[in-house]
Every structure is written in structure tokens, then in C-alpha cells.
Amino acid sequence: MALSRRDFLKSSAAAAAASAVGLSVPKEVEAASKEAQKGWRWDKAVCRFCGTGCGIMIATKDDRIVAVKGDPLAPVNRGLNCIKGYFTAKIMYGADRLKTPLLRMNDKGEFDKKGKFRPVSWKRAFDEMEKQFRKAYNELGPTGVAFFGSGQYTVMEGYAAAKLMKAGFRSNNIDPNARHCMASAVAGFIQTFGIDEPAGCYDDIELTDTIVLWGSNMAEMHPILWARCTDRKLSDPNKVKVVVLSTYTHRSCDLADDVIIFKPNTDLAIWNYIARSIVYDHPDAIDWNFVKEYCVFATGYPDIGYGMRNPKRAEELGYSKKEMQTVWHQDHKKLSEDEKRALAPFGYGNADVMKMKHVKAAGKHWAISFEEFKKSLEPYTLDYVAKVAKGDPDESLESFKAKLQRLKDLYVEKGRKVVSFWTMGMNQHTRGTWDNELSYVVHFLLGKQALPGSGAFSLTGQPSACGTAREVGTFAHRLPADMVVFNPKHRAIAEKIWKLPKGTINPKVGSHIVKIMRDLEDGKIKFAWVHVCNPWQDTANANHWIKAARDMDNFIVVSDGYPGISAKVADLILPSAMIYEKWGAYGNAERRTQHWRQQVTPVGDAMPDIWQYTEFAKRFKLKDVWKEWKLPDGTVLPNVLDEAKKMGYSEDDTLFDVLFANDYYRSFKWPDPIGEGFLNTEAEGDKRNVIGADGKPWKGYGFFIQKALWEEYRKFGEGRGHDYAPFDVYHKVRGLRWPVVNGKDTPWRFNVNYDPYAKREKELGHVKGEFAFYGHALKVIPQGSLTGPDKNKPKIHLPNKAKIFARPYMEPPEVPDNEYDTWLCTGRVLEHWHSGTMTMRVPELYRAVPEALCYMHPEDAKKRGVKRGDLVVIESRRGKCKARVETRGRNRPPRGLVFVPWFDERVYINLVTLDATCPISKQTDYKKCAVKIYKA
């Protein structure tokens, strides 16, 4: 059979696609495919994008990626990919890929903050970077410098960055963009369970009878999981029910049996309605054995503010009068009648204004009785909640009530398995921690948690927000394996593993990502290094942060693959190797860790982030950083140099020598059998002979630094419920769900039938039944009532118990009014990732969705004299941007709300959004603020 070149290529592509999903193809076509694939090397990897963690197969030829397909052996996606996954390799080959360091300079070749970007060598870049770092560090100490981290760090990158910052520079000012996406989930886990991350796994989808989405457009944000949900629904459509709760209609609603459109923030009231119905109307549905054996009731303060700036400081900085209208709610807020009713059991029923007295005690909580808990639920009758929560003005109240009742009935039905999924809708919320806690309330009361097919399940947004940001501990307060910097026992463990003198690690929590921005504006931080994120596009109320970057005496470094907004406002840009140009590992939403090998050489002079951190570490000696420091709050970090000398260190040793090139690290030899035939730029250099940070051709460290980082990191989790397998094992399997004990992973945590740690608690006689909530954090708490802790009662210990929280409904700090009459919600779309820095460079994805649109109800458009395709201004008290109107399509808001994605830097929606956060988690609420919209 003769084939033309065109037919040959088409046949090859068809054969490759067919084989990827296990279809048989004609022999002629198969032969053509094999001919086309001559010289290709296939290897397993993981997708670059969302927290689903899909496995992919990558084909390389002549040092370039030539094909990507779903990995049929990957248990997460079983050979499927979404549109981003299929084009994941193309993100590396955009026309404007950064290939050399760029420094703002004047015509004399000197650094000039007002100068233009000019190409420089790695040495020149690091010379200036070192100079500016030392300037800030020597002036302000460890609190004067910061790293913007990421939920897209590889595990080893995040570990190296955190170790450099916390063990080396003695600063806790490292915080990831995962603060924006998962912090409320984290706080909910820690406060409820005493340990982070979900109990369940993706297998729950195939095992459940009921899928409920709370603020999650899984069809676009976790499309492969949604494919599994769809398959489950279609497998038994009469039994399996799907309910979607959202503030607007989207693609996930197409599969739903019920769609509940609620008013922003009122998910708090809906959760409480379900809990009230259980306690007051269906007490027989309560699993009292579960509740009494494994739970305790608790509550905390409601008057905790909204995570905004101190209003007086905002006034000093010249915030506008309109902006201050909202900011003052951080100090006090007039309560609506609906809020008064919800807050009455907490002692605020007669208060017209809530004074935010407990801003600094937002996370404090105490045990209460069941009767007190029951009292907190009293306001949430069906009539009250329906009136408060109905989000679509065109839906009848009776229709909305009926949906709430059907939702409640699904949860309450005995024997029915229920999984509650959520993502940013619940997490990006000024009461996001409360919202997460309330999800567990319902599941705990019913005994439907930590069981196959039943549980409250927080879905991660980013590919390694779990595996790196959370597990590694790249947050301002964390160390690996759920340890925290303010716990002296945890610091001692870290200092032992890292071989540090006692007292090296700073005990003070650093600045979270929003506070880093505020500290730059305040002059408290003067050096910031951005890793694997785009915070100047991503952070709400961006006008302030642009000013802090460009108009103040701050030095901003951005390591990136492309020139996004953060790079454009920076002083120095460092070109980073992208995902398959380096070794790495990600951890997904079901605790599954997956590793990959370096597939190709980085482009241009781009270098891996690990190399950037370790090369920078070479420029600082112990005597520069381990001396005594007096911090702004009066804390004194001791001089640990004498102790370091006793440990065999010299004060002239570099941080690289001590942290990344000690005898332990050098024991991991390269070459290594696991990497046979593969590149390792950090270990051995590569064919480019890049002129490195020391001005010499880069030839590698000579040891397997990525493996060393992994093996040291996993020491933190061993025996502490965060056990990982050895490095080599992950290159032989399709990921493992931790804890990994005796070579076996754990599908369901806290369940003695599946979790070795829970099983051990039962064997030791610490629990009687099937569950053990063995997390240790926040397990000694006071006692009290709904109105506060009781100092006369002793604290109680809660081994192996979880908490059922009483949390009231409250409104957000900014709601629509006569001038700013519309809710604004932001989010993502299927085709683009986060700020679009990568996906907007992929021609196929760009053509599919070339710009961000303002999704609006047709009646709202008509009211404003605009139509589909018209350009409008979206304006808030903080800023404005322009976008084109869309009144049809995938997102269909109710009247009074618009949805604008944030992937398009030309539609800079974070100039408009409000930088209010959950006071407990410090996560920004991007889902609600008030705007006005008019024709441009």
C-alpha cells in the first residue's frame, strides 16, 4: 500500500492516538506509525498543570520533545488527558522563551531601577543579586528578604528553597502562591484533624453514590476527574446523584441532577442548614458512636476581621477614600439583620456594629458541649437560609427550598455514600477555614468520613500544592511533614536532620504572601525573589504592589520561563529551565507522589531552579548569616557560630558547602543506574557549556543532588504519618499515596482497615473502633461556651479525635451597593493555566481562547446598553480594567454577578479585586467584591 506524505503523517498521528487509548489499528497504519516514531524515546512523566496529577508519556528525539500522550498505566487518568495535558510540552517552545538573564541597566552598564532590560551573563546577574540581597539583609536582617514560592515547585525545588531560606538565611519569609489556593483547606485540616491533607482518594469517585460540588467547576478545573465522575454517573444514573452548588452556572452543571445557585458567602449558611436539619429533624441519622468516640464539639471567635490592612496604616499610605470604605471593616463592621440572627447564639444578636476584637486570635478555639453546638444551629431554618442564600433572582423561593431539601436528604439518607468536593469556591473566602470546617461537621455527624466512597474531599488546584507547598513546608510558618517553626520540638528535629547548630532556625512565623506584598509597600522587605509563580498578576489589589515594585527602593528578582507581568515589573529576570528540562516530583490531591526524569536540555542559557538556589548559596558564608540578629519584634536570633565550629564547620564555609554539598549529599553518586541514558544538568552539566554564575563553563556538581534532596527530605516524614518511598521506587511505579509503609501506599487515612498509623493506634489500645484521627496539632484546647473560653475549666486533651465546629454565617467585607452594584467572581478556564504565562504561548490553546471575557447575564448587559462582544470597563473601589462582554457560552451568571477569568494579562482583573483574606488561613478571597460595569 502506497501512502502520500500527507496520508503518512495523518496515519501516524491517528495510530499514535489510537494506541494511546488502547484501540487496534490497521496493519498499514500501524506500520506508518512505527516508521514515524523511529528514534523516539518514550518515558513516563506527570502533567505540568492542575492538582489532578495525570500521568503522561513523553517522546523525545534529537533532544526535543516530539509527542505527548496520556499514560494508560497511570491510575489517575488511565491514558486520558485534557486539552492542556496534550499540549503540555509545547509550553517549553514559545517564541519569547527567556533564554538569558536580563538586568535593568543604564547606558553605562550599571544597574538602574529605571533602566531598560539588557542581557547579562549569569555572573553579572548573580553579582548584582548578591549586592542587593546583602544590602537588604544587612539593613533589615532576616526579615528584610523574601521568597515568593509556588505550588508548582518540584518537591526538590521547594525543599531546597525552604532549606536555603530557613536553615541558611534564617528567614521564614518564604510563602507559596498555594497560599492563594489551598491555605483555607490546610487550616481546616489542621484545626479539625490536627494533620494536613485529605483522608480519601480518587477511588472514592467510583465507589460513591453521591457527588456534591461546593464551589468547584471540576469539568474545567479537574477535567479528568470530572470524566471519572461522569462515568460513575452514567454507570448507574438512577442511583448516582450529582449536585452542584455555585454562584453561577458552568459546565459542571450540565451533568447535575440539581444546580443550586447561591449568593456569594452563603455556603456557610447552607452547610449550617444541613447540620441543623440533621440535629433537629433527623437525630436518628446521627452516628452517635462515631461522634462520641472520635469527635469533640468546638467553636472560636467570630469577630476576627477580614485579613485586610490595618485601616490606620492604610490611611497613612494614602489609600483612597473609596478604598477605605471597605478597609475600615477590618476594624469594625455594621451587621446586617441576617448576620445578627446568625450571630445571636454567639452573643451578638443585639449588636448593630461588630468591633473586631480578636483579629490576633482568629484561629483560637475551644471545646463546647453538644447542647451549645445545637444552639448555634438554631437560626438556620429552611426559610431563613433560603431567603439568605438564594442567588438567582429569577428562581422562585419554593424551587430553591426544594433543592436545599433534596440536597439535605441525599446527605441524610442512611446507607448512601456521599463525597463532597470543593476547590477555590470554598477556599478563596474570607471565612474559608470555617467553610472547610463546616464540610466536616456534616460528614462527621453522619459518620460518613474516611470511608471508601464517603468523605469531605478538598481538591488541590496546583500540581504540587500538596506535594511541595504543604508537605515540604514552603509556607511562612511551616517545616516539612506538618511541623512548624514556632514549635521548639519541631525546630530541634529539623536542626538535627539539617545538621544545624541548636537555635539556628528562626522561631518567628514569617510573612505570608499577601503580607510580603504589604511589607514591600511598607519598606519592611526590600529584596524579593519570585520562584515558579507570577505574583504581580496573581495578587489582588495589584495597583499597590506594582507601585511597591517599581517606585520604591526594593529589588525584585523573577525566575521564570516567560516574561509575565511579574518579570516586567522586576529588576532582574533569570531564565529558568522548564518542567521536562529537569528532574522533578509532584504530589497531587490524593497524596500521590510522582517523579520524572530530565528529558531534554534546557533552551538557551536557561538553568534549573535548584541550580539557581544552590549557586546563590555559594555566595554566602556562615559568618554572614549565623551571627546574632535582632529582629524587629525584639526577638534575638543567637550567634551559633561557636556551636557550628564544634560541629566541624568553619565560619568561612559557604551555605552551599553546609546545606547542599556536605558528605551526605556527595554520597549520592552520579551517574546512577536510575538515570542511565538521561540528562542531569545539575549533576554533570550539558552540551551547552553554559557560562555559570562563577564565570566558568558549567560542568555539574558531580553528585546526584536531586536524589540527595529527596532522600534527606523524606527523613522528616518517617514515623510521623508522612512516610515516602525511596527515590528509585518512584521511577518504577506510577506514583504512591503517602503514607507509604513497608512498600504499600495508603488509599484512605484514619481508617484502621487501610491506614497503618490508624491500625497501630488500635493495636496499642488507643482507639476502640475503626478510626483514629491521629494528628497531633492543636489537640490540647480550653473549654468554654459559644461566647468564649472559660478560664475556670481545665484544658482537655484530644488524642485520636477530630473537631465538630460551630461556625456562624457572616457576610463578606464588601457587598454590592447603589454605586458598585454587581458581584465580581474570578477564576480559571479549561484551556489556560493560572496567569496564562505558559498556555497563552501554545498556539492551539491561544486560538481556542484568545482573551478573557466578562461573562454577564443578558439582562444586565441590556440594562447597561451593551451587547455580546462590546468592550466594558469593570471598576471597583481599587482599580479598573477592560474586557469584552460574553452573554452566552460556558459560564452563565445570574443577574447581579459577573465572572472574569484572570489568565489574560491584558484583562488585568486583579487591579480590581479585593485583598481581603481568611483571617485564619490568610488565603485571599478572589470570589467576591463589588464592581460597577459600563461601556468603554
Curated annotation (Swiss-Prot):
It catalyses: 2 Fe(II)-[cytochrome] + nitrate + 2 H(+) = 2 Fe(III)-[cytochrome] + nitrite + H2O. Pfam families: Molybdop_Fe4S4, Molybdopterin, Molydop_binding, TAT_signal. Its main location: periplasm. Its EC number is 1.9.6.1. It comes from the Bacteria. Residues 40-96 form the 4Fe-4S Mo/W bis-MGD-type domain. GO terms for molecular function: 4 iron, 4 sulfur cluster binding; electron transfer activity; iron ion binding; molybdenum ion binding; molybdopterin cofactor binding; nitrate reductase (cytochrome) activity. Binds 1 [4Fe-4S] cluster. Binds 1 molybdenum-bis(molybdopterin guanine dinucleotide) (Mo-bis-MGD) cofactor per subunit. SUPFAM superfamilies: ADC-like (SSF50692), Formate dehydrogenase/DMSO reductase, domains 1-3 (SSF53706). SMART domains: Molybdop_Fe4S4. Catalytic subunit of the periplasmic nitrate reductase complex NapAB. Receives electrons from NapB and catalyzes the reduction of nitrate to nitrite. This is Periplasmic nitrate reductase.
